[in-house]
Swiss-Prot record:
Its main location: plastid. GO terms for molecular function: structural constituent of ribosome. PANTHER family: 50S RIBOSOMAL PROTEIN L33, CHLOROPLASTIC, LARGE RIBOSOMAL SUBUNIT PROTEIN BL33C. Transmembrane segments: none annotated. InterPro entries: Ribosomal_bL33, Ribosomal_bL33_CS, Ribosomal_bL33_sf, Ribosomal_zn-bd. Keywords: Chloroplast, Plastid, Ribonucleoprotein, Ribosomal protein. This is Large ribosomal subunit protein bL33c. The gene is rpl33. GO terms for cellular component: chloroplast; ribonucleoprotein complex; ribosome. Belongs to the bacterial ribosomal protein bL33 family. It comes from the Eukaryota.
Length: 65
């Protein structure tokens, strides 16, 4: 059988504010895992989600594994 590429892949989203802020009280930035369809969204995913470290809704960017 031929190998087929999966259209759905698991990605990691990281808080934009926590990752850029080096003076944060928390050593790690907030992260979410989710899935995206490679055919529908070939570019990097950007979502607005709640950050438990910042205590507000912030922008989350897709990062490399």
């Amino acid at each position: 059988m031929a190998k087929s590429k999966d259209t759905r892949i698991t990605i990691i989203l990281e808080c934009n504010i926590c990752s850029n802020n080096k003076k944060s009280n928390f050593p790690k930035s907030s992260r979410y895992t989710t899935q995206k369809n490679r055919r529908n969204t070939p570019n990097r995913l950007i979502l607005k989600k709640f950050c438990s470290n910042c205590q507000q809704h912030t922008i989350y960017n897709e990062i490399k594994k």
